[in-house]
């Protein structure tokens, strides 16, 4: 170091040496006492000496903590937010009415996926179709009685026993379209062989013209008389006769006795008539009165005859057909002798029901001469409520085995007000989703509505409790929790089964009651009719006597059966209450088991599995995929900020929130150390300079304009210098001297986490640990203005997700509006600029700067 001294004289003053030093020397001389080194390169550098090793360790620690941020936590939080928002969307979607589902009550299955356009479905074990043994489908043109936009159970169920109404008795196997072609039957007189030939102009054989009809579905070809079929629009399509005619139900007819079918099921066609059994040995007289059998409603030119070998004989013929595949059904020919037949409208063709003890033949007969008829067995016998293929002589009725059909109303228009709610499988009974449409419940329902509501509530509580508390379950208790959950669900399912059984019994009771009422109504109508008529025609064998016709009109229900039903309902009520009690106990045990918190990722995983189970109940919906795509997009765009904030909140003392608090504590105490060092420096100056510290600071601050802590002291009154002079020595203790010699030691101790000598430091560490480690406290506390949402449960997550979505959508809308406004402004500016340039160009053209027009000069 080079030092040059100039000794000069100041008039009246003291000779002062003037030295020239380097910047480094000036900085080193003041390092011991000044808290900051005031050079132009680093005015704000702290006086405390930080070791490079500590800085490296801090950097390494921060890099390690950054690497410790596991991806599973982010995935769990993302799935949790997605599941919460998706659950809200699904909750809203499941409550919407589905217009394409029409029905009253679907027990045992849904109407979804049914191949029929039906409003009511019945199954073989469902007593709603009681007392039928065989179920038939039919259509109806009769409108259901509506009262205030509501249909009662019996009217909607459409089982008015013995009620006469217009309908089309439709059988799914036979009353359908057939592809038919006209054929001729040719036979030689010497043999019983008949050939089937395809011709255009047909001729009669056995008194009828013939059709060869094909049923493609069953690979069956039927040879039938043309009188049995009805052509549709002059095409090759034919349907059996009677498919679109008026029918009514009656009590007794021969088919009841022979087939053993329940008496309130059959329907036949008008007008009423009676038939007499075999009279003379060789012939049977057919008339429209007689005491033996009450048949009910048949078409004109139809009669009933008891089968006898003297009345009708089978004519055995061999039908030869060239080529055919599958089954070829040929008719059975009879020759019959009937006497005293009066044909309506003098028609030659009549219909005759020929019955025996073990079989029935429905004959179509043509009168060839006086009492002789050529008859053929009809392929489509119009008997009962459906069109059945009647048995052949070699196909006798032994065990009364019939085709089974499902009963349904295939008419959407008359029950279009009924709708089913598409549920996720939780609700036991689907109900109407609209006001003023629903089942009318009365007191006789035995509290079924309350029981159903209890089952629904128990199921909803079980599922919601399972999904909510699974987030607070320890890993080692998951299996136990699932067992309790399964027990709750099993109890709920058992309760649903019991309710289903109650509903079956209830429907049977209501339908039987309705049947009894209708029997009484019809009996009253018949008695009123007989009071007007007296006796039927001239026979006087069937007259009104005022006594009930017991066997014809059926039997009323006995009280013992009704009492048995009531007792069963009471037993089921007790079983349901027991089942609900067990479900409640299992649910309480599940709540007791869920007593400790678990990871958020496990909650997200379990909740996502529940959502995945709910999604199939929605069906194929494009709205579902659009909503899920938008949710995923919004969450992906907003997840970084959410995850960053949640990371600071929930990661504990080692999280960024803890580090932030530590840094705040460090800077705060560093500030205190700097202030204390400055005060000690002032004490030293006061002791050395004798009160000239103020002048010294003024000179220093005039040369160095730094904004440190000393400015605060400069603004204070100058009296503090004297107080420091007087009491400065009391501040300088052994500990103070040690801290002056090593100003960074206390700070390093705080950094190392000792904090034993500072009570404030210890309390702060405790506060950090309590805020970082306790999950329950994060619901009511906040760190840096961020609410700890993840531990507040599913409802808060759902609300937060919806708020985020609404905010994002509003943000996108506002940004889009800003873009539109910016584009409009640019367009307007462009238009104005074009107009300005055009006007400027026109103005320049009209007013050029230099005139090229020379004016004429006159001399």
Curated annotation (Swiss-Prot):
- Keyword Lyase, does the record have it? no
Report residue spans for region: Fusion peptide. 446-466
* Glycosylation-annotated residues: 40, 112, 141, 148, 186, 214, 233, 244, 340, 368, 399, 406, 411, 422, 483, 490, 550, 557
Its Gene Ontology cellular component terms are: host cell plasma membrane; membrane; viral envelope; virion membrane
Q: Which residues cross the membrane?
A: 615-635
Propeptide residue span(s): 1-6
Instruction: Give residue ranges on the Cytoplasmic side.
Output: 636-859
Q: Name one GO molecular function term.
A: structural molecule activity
What keywords tag this UniProt record? Cleavage on pair of basic residues, Coiled coil, Disulfide bond, Glycoprotein, Host cell membrane, Host membrane, Host-virus interaction, Membrane, Transmembrane, Transmembrane helix, Viral attachment to host cell, Viral envelope protein, Virion, Virus entry into host cell
Q: Write out the GO biological process terms.
A: symbiont entry into host cell; virion attachment to host cell
Q: How is it modified after translation?
A: Specific enzymatic cleavages in vivo yield mature proteins. Envelope glycoproteins are synthesized as an inactive precursor that is N-glycosylated and processed likely by host cell furin or by a furin-like protease in the Golgi to yield the mature SU and TM proteins. The cleavage site between SU and TM requires the minimal sequence [KR]-X-[KR]-R.
UniProt site (Cleavage):
444-445, 684-685
Instruction: Specify where the region named Immunosuppression lies, as residue ranges.
Output: 498-513
Q: Which InterPro entries match?
A: GP41-like (IPR000328), Gp90_EIAV (IPR001361)
User: What CDD domains does the record tag this protein with?
Assistant: HIV-1-like_HR1-HR2
The coiled-coil regions, if any, are 576-624, 663-699
Provide the membrane-side ranges marked Extracellular in the record.
7-614
What's this chain's function? The surface protein (SU) attaches the virus to the host cell by binding to its receptor. This interaction triggers the refolding of the transmembrane protein (TM) and is thought to activate its fusogenic potential by unmasking its fusion peptide. Fusion occurs at the host cell plasma membrane.
Subunit record text: The mature envelope protein (Env) consists of a trimer of SU-TM heterodimers attached by noncovalent interactions or by a labile interchain disulfide bond.
Protein's name according to its UniProt entry: Envelope glycoprotein
């Amino acid at each position: 170091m080079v030092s040059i001294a100039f000794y000069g004289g100041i008039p009246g003053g003291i000779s002062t040496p003037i030295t020239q030093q380097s910047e480094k020397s000036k900085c080193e001389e003041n390092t011991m006492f000044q808290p900051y080194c005031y050079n132009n390169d680093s005015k704000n550098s702290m006086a405390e000496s930080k070791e490079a090793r500590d800085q490296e360790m801090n950097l390494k620690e921060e890099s390690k903590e950054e690497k410790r941020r596991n991806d599973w936590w982010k995935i769990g939080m993302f799935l949790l937010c997605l599941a919460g928002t998706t659950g809200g969307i699904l909750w809203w979607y499941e409550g919407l009415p589905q217009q394409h589902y029409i029905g009253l009550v679907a027990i045992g299955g849904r109407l979804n996926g049914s191949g029929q356009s039906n409003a009511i479905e019945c199954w073989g074990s469902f007593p709603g179709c009681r007392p039928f043994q065989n179920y038939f489908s039919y259509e109806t043109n009769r409108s259901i009685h509506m009262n205030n936009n509501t249909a009662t159970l019996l009217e909607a169920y459409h089982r008015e026993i013995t009620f006469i109404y217009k309908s089309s008795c439709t059988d799914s196997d036979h009353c359908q379209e057939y592809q038919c072609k006209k054929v001729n039957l040719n036979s030689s007189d010497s043999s019983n062989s008949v050939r089937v030939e395809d011709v255009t102009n047909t001729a009669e054989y056995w008194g009828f013209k013939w059709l060869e009809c094909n049923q493609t579905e069953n690979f069956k070809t039927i040879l039938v008389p043309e009188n049995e079929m009805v052509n549709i629009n002059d095409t090759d399509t034919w349907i059996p006769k009677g498919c679109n005619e008026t029918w009514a139900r009656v009590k007794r007819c021969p088919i009841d006795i022979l087939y053993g079918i329940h008496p309130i099921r059959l329907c036949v066609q008008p007008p009423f008539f009676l038939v007499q059994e075999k009279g003379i040995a060789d012939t049977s007289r057919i008339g429209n009165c007689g005491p033996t059998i009450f048949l009910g409603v048949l078409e004109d030119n139809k009669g009933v005859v008891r089968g006898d070998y003297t009345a009708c004989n089978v004519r055995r013929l061999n039908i030869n057909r060239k080529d055919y595949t599958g089954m070829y059904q040929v008719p059975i020919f009879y020759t019959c002798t009937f006497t005293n037949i009066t044909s309506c409208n003098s028609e030659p063709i009549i219909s005759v029901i020929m019955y025996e003890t073990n079989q029935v033949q429905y004959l179509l007969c043509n009168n060839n001469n006086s009492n002789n008829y050529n008859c053929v067995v009809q392929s489509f016998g119009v008997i009962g409520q459906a069109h059945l293929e009647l048995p052949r002589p070699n196909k006798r009725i032994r065990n009364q085995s019939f085709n089974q059909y499902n009963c349904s109303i295939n008419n959407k228009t008359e029950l279009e007000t009924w709708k089913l709610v598409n549920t996720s499988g939780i609700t036991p009974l689907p109900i109407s989703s609209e006001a003023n449409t629903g089942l009318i419940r009365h007191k006789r329902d035995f509290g079924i509505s309350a029981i159903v509501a209890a089952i629904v509530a128990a199921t909803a509580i079980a599922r919601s409790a399972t999904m909510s508390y699974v987030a607070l379950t320890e890993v080692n208790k998951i299996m136990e929790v699932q067992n309790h959950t399964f027990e709750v669900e099993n109890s709920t399912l058992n309760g649903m089964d019991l309710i289903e059984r109650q509903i079956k019994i209830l429907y049977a009771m209501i339908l039987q009651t309705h049947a009894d009422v209708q029997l009484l109504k019809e009996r009253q109508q018949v008695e009123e009719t007989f009071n007007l008529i007296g006796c039927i025609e001239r026979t006087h064998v069937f007259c009104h006597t005022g006594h009930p016709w017991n066997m014809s009109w059926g039997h009323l229900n006995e009280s013992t059966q009704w009492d048995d039903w009531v007792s069963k309902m009471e037993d089921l009520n007790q079983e349901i209450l027991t089942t609900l009690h067990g479900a409640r106990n299992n649910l309480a045990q599940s709540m007791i088991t869920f007593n400790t918190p678990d990871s958020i990722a496990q909650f997200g995983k379990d909740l996502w599995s529940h959502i995945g189970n709910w999604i199939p109940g929605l069906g194929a919906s494009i709205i579902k995929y659009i909503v899920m795509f938008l949710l995923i997009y919004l969450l992906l765009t907003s997840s970084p900020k959410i995850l960053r904030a949640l990371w600071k909140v929930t990661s504990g003392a080692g999280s960024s929130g803890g580090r932030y608090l530590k840094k705040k504590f460090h800077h705060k105490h560093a500030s205190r150390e700097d202030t204390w060092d400055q005060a000690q420096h002032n004490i030293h100056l006061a002791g050395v300079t004798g009160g000239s510290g103020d002048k010294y600071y003024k000179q220093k601050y005039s040369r160095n304009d730094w904004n440190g802590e000393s400015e605060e002291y400069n603004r204070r009154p100058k009296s503090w210098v004297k107080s420091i002079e007087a009491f400065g020595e009391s501040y300088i203790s052994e500990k103070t001297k040690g801290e002056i010699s090593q100003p960074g030691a206390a700070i390093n101790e705080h950094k190392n986490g000792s904090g034993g000598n500072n009570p404030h430091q210890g309390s702060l560490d405790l506060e950090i640990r309590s805020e970082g480690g306790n999950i329950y406290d994060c619901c009511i506390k906040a760190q840096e203005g961020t609410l700890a949402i993840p531990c507040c449960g599913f409802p808060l997550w759902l609300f937060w997700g919806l708020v985020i979505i609404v905010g994002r959508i509003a943000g996108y809308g506002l940004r889009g509006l800003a873009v539109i406004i910016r584009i409009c402004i640019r367009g307007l500016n462009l238009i104005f600029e074009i107009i300005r340039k055009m006007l400027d160009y026109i103005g320049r053209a009209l007013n050029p700067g230099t005139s090229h027009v020379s004016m004429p000069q006159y001399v």
